[in-house]
Amino acid sequence: MNVKRITIIVIFLLAFLTGVNFVIFPALGTAFTDPSLFALSSSQFGNLFIPQVICIIISCLAAPFLVNKWGPKIILTFGVLLMLISTGSLWILHYFIEAKSSLFSLLMIMVAFTGTGFGLSITTLNPLAASLFEKENSSAILILQFLVGLGTSTSPLLMNLIGDVKNWMYVPGSIFIAVSAVLMAFLFLKIEKGTFFNLPAHFKISDKLWIFFIAIILYGCIEGTFGSFGGIILKNKGLDNNAANLGLSLFWGGVALNRLLFGILSKRWNLSSFFLVSPLCVGILLFILLVYPNINILLLMMFLIGFFMGSIFPGSIGWGTIEFPAYSVLVSGFLMAANQIGTGTVTNILGHFSNHISFILGILILLMLVISALFFYLKRGSKIKDAF
């Protein structure tokens, strides 16, 4: 097996484990709110993720400049180490579970470490994956994002595997060991900084990149709505709890399947037209969900909404990388931050509109139409066919 192939395997495995590590705190929600363990209130558990969102945004915006100065290997290693410190500390915390007065403050610090580490890691991983496939940048980013998403969906399953919530410490323990092993392998790789990660000495952010930024903030609002509010929407439309949870799983399954297929098939066919019409398709599906919420097709609708949303975010990073090759790492950080801004904003305001589902769906339709209009505007004179 040649060196490049080993590098690709390690990078993509690290992306998967970064996704697993990232959702460890929400995955342990039952342990955190268990009165016999961490005994956090519902509001404390919700507030736990505020520093995470803030730290992700800051680190995503800072990462391009840090990578430009010290190179991708150092920054990615630092990001993974921050997440490992958080996960390892959480693992050790089971020895001090009786000190309940300090637990919330300690968890806030750990979550901040996880957010900072994730922002640095994922912002660096996107262009690093793209640099390994110079003629297939977008495909590489789509597949990498598929693996990150697969990781985020795997971590909650670990709680089901361990059974009793009192065995929660085995989740951070197993993740810590797995990530440490892959990080050790990564440290032995030779990762060149290369021109792919260099920023010009003087630059101005293009107006087109600002448009990408706005589009992804809006996308983040929609993704965040389904991520934190999808179950409530489905129950409002007539599904019971089990069916609503299944619908949410199908939504994320659709997202993951699209990213995998898009990453594979775009190597053979030009999928730029599919990418451009995807926001319109989501808008149409949301409109049907609003005016004709047939309980028999709701689960299919959730899968299709997720499927057509799947390529929008990573595809935008890939497209932006092709449009602005001199700013590839900046594109990654800029759009990762935009996604978190949208997701974080909508997550914190949706609770005030829980009784206005039709209004929420109407806003989502409008946002998708705006995203579609922005993409068609960006298409003019662009290199989108080279991206997909």
Task: Enumerate the predicted regions with their spans.
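Extracytoplasmic gate region of multi-pass secondary transporters
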Residues: 25-26, 207-257
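Helix-to-loop junctions at the C-terminal end of transmembrane segments
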Residues: 59-72, 163, 259-270, 354
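C-terminal ends and interior cores of transmembrane alpha-helices
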Residues: 81-100, 281-293
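Hydrophobic core of transmembrane alpha-helices in multi-pass small-molecule transporters
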Residues: 101-120, 297-311
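Cytoplasmic helix-loop-helix junction between adjacent transmembrane helices
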Residues: 110-146
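Helix-loop-helix hairpin linking two adjacent transmembrane segments in secondary transporters
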Residues: 135-136, 143-191
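C-terminal transmembrane helical hairpin of 12-TM major facilitator-type secondary transporters
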Residues: 269-316
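A late C-terminal transmembrane helix in Major Facilitator Superfamily
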Residues: 324-357
